[in-house]
């Protein structure tokens, strides 16, 4: 499906800023991008889209389900393409790199903990903080 069709299916017009920002996410080597990351990528491509427009489009994409937002301890929101698969995150407290992982045993345990405490789990997000392998090598 083309980006134009995807946006239209989500109820959004396929404007130049929306198409360009979606393209940035699709071709980025990084999976998690802040508004500032997107803005810098646009500048690097000599595309004139203001930071306020970037924030507005990211919010629209989040509301439409195209992107998901995470707020890690870094204090700034980061966005990633919503592929529909649940995953958790490991964050390096030294360099800020975000690693994704999925573990079925952890998922089962979380549902059990919720059930054992009288909860029906609707949603969850697990974020683990530590030092990544690359940063450990530099110590």
UniProtKB/Swiss-Prot annotation:
Subcellular location, record wording: Cytoplasm
Binding site for Fe cation: 86, 88, 107, 124
Superkingdom, taxonomy of origin: Bacteria
Region (Dimerization): 84-139
Gene Ontology cellular component list: cytosol; protein-DNA complex
Alphabetical GO biological process terms: negative regulation of DNA-templated transcription; negative regulation of siderophore biosynthetic process; positive regulation of DNA-templated transcription
GO molecular function: DNA-binding transcription activator activity; transcription cis-regulatory region binding; zinc ion binding
Keywords attached to this entry: Cytoplasm, DNA-binding, Iron, Metal-binding, Repressor, Transcription, Transcription regulation, Zinc
InterPro entries tied to this protein: FUR (IPR002481), Fur_C (IPR043135), WH-like_DNA-bd_sf (IPR036388), WH_DNA-bd_sf (IPR036390)
Pfam families: FUR
UniProt binding sites for Zn(2+): 32, 80, 89, 92, 95, 100
Region (DNA-binding) location: 1-83
Subunit text: Homodimer.
Family label: Belongs to the Fur family.
Physiological role: Acts as a global negative controlling element, employing Fe(2+) as a cofactor to bind the operator of the repressed genes.
Designated name of the protein: Ferric uptake regulation protein
């Amino acid at each position: 499906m083309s980006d134009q069709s995807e946006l239209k299916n989500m109820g959004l017009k396929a404007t130049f800023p929306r198409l360009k920002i979606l393209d940035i996410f699709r071709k980025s080597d990084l999976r998690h991008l802040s508004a500032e990351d997107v803005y810098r990528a646009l500048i690097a491509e000599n595309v004139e889209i203001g930071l306020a427009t970037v924030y507005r489009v990211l919010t629209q994409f989040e509301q439409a389900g195209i992107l998901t937002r995470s707020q890690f301890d870094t204090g700034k929101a980061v966005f990633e393409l919503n592929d529909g698969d649940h995953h958790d995150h490991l964050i390096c407290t030294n360099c800020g790199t975000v690693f994704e992982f999925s573990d079925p045993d952890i998922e089962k345990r979380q549902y059990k903990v919720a059930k054992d405490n009288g909860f029906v789990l609707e949603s969850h997000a697990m974020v683990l903080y530590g030092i990544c392998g690359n940063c450990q090598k530099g110590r």
